[in-house]
Amino acid sequence: MPNVVVVGAQWGDEGKGRVVDWLAAQADLVARYNGGHNAGHTLVVGGKTYKLALLPSGVVRGKRGVIGNGVALDPEALLAEIGRMAELGLSVTPDNLSIAENATLVLPIHRAIDQAQERLRREPIGTTLRGIGPAYEDKVGRRGLRVGDLAEPGRLAAKLDVLVDHHNAWFRGLGLDEYSRDAMLATLVDLAPRILPFVRPVWADLNDATDRGERILFEGSQAVMLDIDWGTYPFVTSSGTVASAAAAGTGLGASKLGHVLGVTKAYATRVGGGPFLTELSDATGETLRARGQEFGVNTGRPRRCGWLDAAQLRQAVRISGIDSLALTKLDVLDGFESIELCVGYEFDGARVDHLPASLDAQSRAKPVYERFDGWRGTVKGVRERAALPRAAQDFIARVEAVAGAPVSMITTGAERDDTIVLRNPFDAAAGA
């Protein structure tokens, strides 16, 4: 199938937006399948800066966008984002955006719960406090509201009763103010006429598009190591972030997903708490942060920085079925005298090639590094792998060998054209 799934292969912020933007020009549809407005990215197109959190990146390139059922949708946040796009001259309408009728709604009460839970934790997870986790909790608890419920005010009110009663018992137990069901219902009834025109049976649309041979680009949020099952639990997000989540989160069968492209920086970053074995809390880490401008798009939070963990990358490749890698921000490594690459771990006196599952075990694991010579000058503007400095080529080759996947794309600068394409993922998906 000529489709491509883009997943983050680390802890997020790998540059997926940049890669998706490049691929979107070749796609017919771009579909979001997980997460919510807790992760964002910035695109610069035609001299205009677009900051996206819920909208699929393809709408900026004039492509049809899809928000799948796996997304936790805050209707107020979506409408605000559509409004910001309008101010930039980009019209988002039901003609170029569809929303799955069974996508979960994020409500004001979820944000309040998120904030209260984070305050109460002995060790904060580092959530963005936007209500995504509590919304997914309600989804799994079978009391969540879905986008399609907006079309049935009577049913909406009854479901909201169940949800609010459940959470108000928790608020009362903590001595916190209870939430008004009537106020939330009034807000949702007011929002419904602006959301419902976008609602479609997305699963059917995507299957029909695939049958017609159209190219679908699946745009993942967060990353493999933040997956609710496979990430560094409990310091994870609340949804599936591996490639198989694209099937569950849109309704297109797994056999139709096509090529899986994992995106990784040439170094590593992480936001919030949780294990990060190659983290650098020294001048080198500060240099990576400054050169890479490692601050959150939505939150402005500084990201933790460290050397690339190719052993972790191998784990992501195997768990998510990654066919090839996009290696981003290679230029950030310009000028380092030497570069280190984690190729495994030492754990209780033994060498292991994967990250243990438990937090206690992870705290005892130590990275095993290989050192590479750095390179002088810059890789910016280089358009072919063979034209990269020999030291950079050696580093990339070792990343491929340890991770167990070929590098198909390399970004060497901030401009869209600063991209080396070794094999187009859409061509790979089509078997070309």
Curated annotation (Swiss-Prot):
Chemical reaction(s) catalysed: IMP + L-aspartate + GTP = N(6)-(1,2-dicarboxyethyl)-AMP + GDP + phosphate + 2 H(+)
Membrane recorded as keyword: no
Binding site for GTP: 12-18, 40-42, 303, 329-331, 411-413
Residues given in the record as substrate binding sites: 297-303
Top-level division of the source organism's lineage: Bacteria
Residue positions binding IMP: 13-16, 38-41, 128, 142, 222, 237, 301
EC number(s) stated in the UniProt entry for this protein: 6.3.4.4
Matches recorded under Pfam families: Adenylsucc_synt (PF00709)
SUBUNIT field: Homodimer.
Protein name: Adenylosuccinate synthetase 2
Gene label: purA2
